[in-house]
A protein has these predicted regions:
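Alpha-helical scaffold/interaction cores of sigma-54-like transcription cofactors
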Residues: 1-469
């Protein structure tokens, strides 16, 4: 990511900061306390790439902090509250000392370009990234994690080395435009898609070998149909299927060499790569030419027909090379919303900003209270509609809780949740101070975040320990 020169350069940072300055900054905690012994501190510096790399990371981290605090002042007002400042300082410290500031600068760059330059609709944020206040202040997400008690540790845990993973939703039609923008900005040789390998499953291995062996199609189909969909307590593969199905044992000992050899070679080929594809959304953006890090091949872009670079390592291996995968997702729902907003503008003369519409709109709650939610993701099943009519949701938090509760296991608590909302059952807390985190869900523990926060409140767990629960 190209940082504006008027902010600073690596050369200036090398003159301004000594290696001792960097050692202290990257091995102490966010409050300047020594938390690592000397050997662990040296190992951390080495893991981050040594002092030469640290100068770049610090420059990126300082610029990221500037953008985050500028965004925070726009969103929360100036001066910032102590809660917001402490949250940002902690998150920025974790991002810096894990070596990820450049990643966040790139993500905010293409998301803001999509919104402001390309006119592409971007989702409000999904998954654990919505727990980052820095991501919110940068415009990566549109959900205030502090307001909704979303936790950063579910995204990046200081006690668990893990790569950041931000799934970014774009409208279906605009996803390709964003990818082209990224390729043009960062360079065609520095951007690549990720290969996928399709392997031979059990039935497919039988059919492929049978075709080459010129086994009659009817016999090929018969053998494939003998393979069960699952085997109790065992992995589904051909050796286990033969041991489980008597007819396959007979076929394996068949006097017909074509039948015997079909099963023999299918066992040898099962699980081997049959073909390649391109990951639907995974993309790599590299600071150097991608070929300096991984072998690449080319594939045809389905949208444009042009050739594009594809890594020859699949997603599960890419992380071991030090490269970070970014997911560019195309979401049809965003295209529908975008078209609806445009239709409102054309026919009603009203210009809507979908990110700023009220979440307290009475007419919308009336639809939910009536169970009229067909076509609404995760709220359209008959069972959900029934519970919505019983609940009569009146706050956004009610809808969030119903979405979390409507799944096997937690569903058992829905009647209790509804009764507590309407006063038919008392709202009780095992320990009075638990009300702080359970009030919005009427005393019922619904979210993982509540468990994490309660463990810190009641048992003095650290941020990292609460995530490991």
């Amino acid at each position: 990511f190209a940082i504006p020169e008027d902010f600073g350069t690596e050369e200036e940072y090398r003159k301004r900061y000594t290696e001792k300055d960097l050692f202290d900054e990257f091995t102490q905690d966010e409050n300047g306390n020594v938390v690592l012994d000397e050997d662990a501190a040296k190992a951390k510096i080495k893991r981050l790439g040594g002092y030469d790399k640290l100068y770049r990371i610090k420059l990126e981290a300082d610029y990221l902090a500037k953008l985050a605090f500028d965004g925070a002042k726009r969103l929360y007002g100036d001066p910032l509250s102590d809660e917001v400042k402490e949250r940002l300082v902690f998150e920025l410290y974790i991002m810096k000392t894990m070596g990820f500031p450049g990643y966040f600068l790139i993500v905010q760059d293409f998301i803001n370009a999509a919104r402001t330059q390309l006119g592409v609709s971007v989702g409000p944020g999904r998954g654990s990234a919505a727990g980052s206040a820095v991501a919110y202040c940068l415009g990566i997400t549109k959900i205030d994690p502090i307001q909704y008690d979303l936790l950063f540790e579910r995204f990046l845990n200081p006690d668990r080395i893990s790569l950041p993973d931000i799934d970014v939703d774009f409208d279906d039609d605009g996803r390709g435009e964003v990818l082209r923008w990224v390729t043009e900005k960062y360079g065609q040789e520095k951007v690549a898609h990720i290969i996928t390998y399709g392997t031979m499953a059990t039935k497919l291995a039988i059919k492929d070998v049978a075709r080459v062996q010129k086994l009659p199609l009817s016999e090929s189909d018969r053998l494939a149909k003998l393979v069960p969909d699952k085997i109790p307590d065992k992995k589904l593969n051909l050796p286990n299927a033969i041991a489980y199905v008597p007819e396959l044992q007979v076929a394996e000992a068949s006097p017909d060499p074509l039948v015997r050899d079909t099963l023999k070679y299918a066992k040898m080929l099962e699980g081997n790569v049959r073909g390649t594809g391109v990951h639907a959304c995974g993309t790599i953006i590299c600071r150097d030419d991608i070929t300096d890090w991984v072998p690449v091949s080319t594939a045809d872009d389905k949208e444009t027909g042009e050739k594009m670079l594809v890594t020859q390592y699949e997603g599960s291996v890419i992380e071991d090379t030090g490269l970070i995968k970014m997911d560019f997702l195309g979401l049809k729902t965003l295209s529908i919303i975008k078209e609806a907003v445009e239709n409102v503008r054309l026919h009603r003369g009203v210009k809507l900003d979908i990110d700023k519409i009220s979440i307290k709109d009475p007419a919308t709650y009336k639809l939910y209270c009536d169970g009229r939610t067909i076509g609404t993701f995760q709220f359209e099943s008959a069972g959900m509609q029934k519970y919505l009519r019983e609940l009569q949701p009146s706050t956004f938090e009610d809808l969030i809780a119903m979405n979390a509760l409507y799944r096997p296991g937690p569903m058992d608590y829905i009647p209790d949740f509804i009764d507590r909302k309407w006063g038919r059952k008392p709202i009780e807390y095992d320990i009075p101070i638990m009300e702080k985190y359970l009030k919005d869900t009427y005393g019922i523990t619904v979210y993982q975040e509540q468990v994490m926060l309660l463990s810190r409140l009641l048992a003095d767990f650290t941020r990292g320990e609460s995530d490991a629960l």
